Structures are given as structure tokens and as C-alpha cells.
Amino acid sequence: CQKRRFWIKSEVTQTDVTKENLDDFLLKNIDQKFDDNDSFICNPINISGAKKIKIIKRGWRNLIKDPSIIFNPNKETISFHFDMHHGYQNLEKAIELLDEENRNDFKEYVRNRNYYNPHIMCIARPEVLENWFKNLFSWLERCEGEFGFKSLKGYDTQRLYAYLAERYLSYWFKKNTKFNELPWTIINI
């Protein structure tokens, strides 16, 4: 069984779509009213509201710095979530390797938001994609020098570069393009 992600029509919710009726709800064309958009990214997901025990088990280092996290879901930011699930301070270390133009803004972005646009899925104009990939891969190459591959083991860090790209996509497309968010769904095929 493999989970696949699909763009769906705007008037549909994820729960309406099943494996059997998927073709009826797939997004096959972008509505003309969006012709002046540069890009489309997935509707965001909210990452706050983790169970208290999970915050204690996986976010204890962050709790030592700021115990109020456990009582304030707004403090369960992208940065906090990344620390819990993909290695403490790995996102901060990676951000330090970003180009100067994006470093401080992205740091601010991940420290103050508790949602992001998931799955590294986008639809964009060719020139936008070219700029996105140039910026992303030059950063990820620098990250490879810092993190390598051999030390990245298990769920937490094995796919570290994909997790970094996923968080960066939200920031980059919102900063650099006229974007719109579109619904998506996951179907087990």
C-alpha cells in the first residue's frame, strides 16, 4: 500500500475523495481566474496541539528553555516541531547556511508560525521553478557539507533534506511569488 498525494478541486474536501471516485475530483486544470498567479502550493497544515506527553518526551530541550510551550499551542512553531521530530537544532544549523537574502527572514518565519504548506508540491511557471530549484539546491548542497548522509539514520533524520525543503517551500513561494493555496488529499493506492 502506497500513499499518494493529489491536487483536488477547490470545492471538495479531503474526506469527500476516495480511491474509487478520485478521478471525479482530481484537479486537471487551473481555473482562468488564477491566470495572473505565479505559483500554487498545498493548503497548509497546522502543527500545533501535540499531546503533552509527546512534548515532554521529544521536546524536553525546548521546554527547558521555555516551559510555557506546554501550555501555549501558539509556541508549537515550525522550529519547535522540527526540533521534536527531525533533530534538535538541525533546522537552526541549516538556516545558518542559507544565503544572506533569506537567512533572517526564514529564521523569523519558522520561529513564528505553527503551520506550513506540506509535501513539497507546487505548480509554477518555469522561471519560478528555475529560481526555486537554484536557491533550494544550492542551500541543500551546503547542508550536505554540514550534515552529510552517514549520520542521518532512522525516521527523525534519514530524510532530513526533504524535511528542510518542505519547510522552506512555504516561506520561499510566499516571499517570491504571487501564489495561491490549493486543496490536496492523500489516497492509499
What are these regions (language model features)?
Residues 1-189:
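ER/Golgi luminal nucleotide-sugar-dependent glycosyltransferases, focusing on the catalytic module
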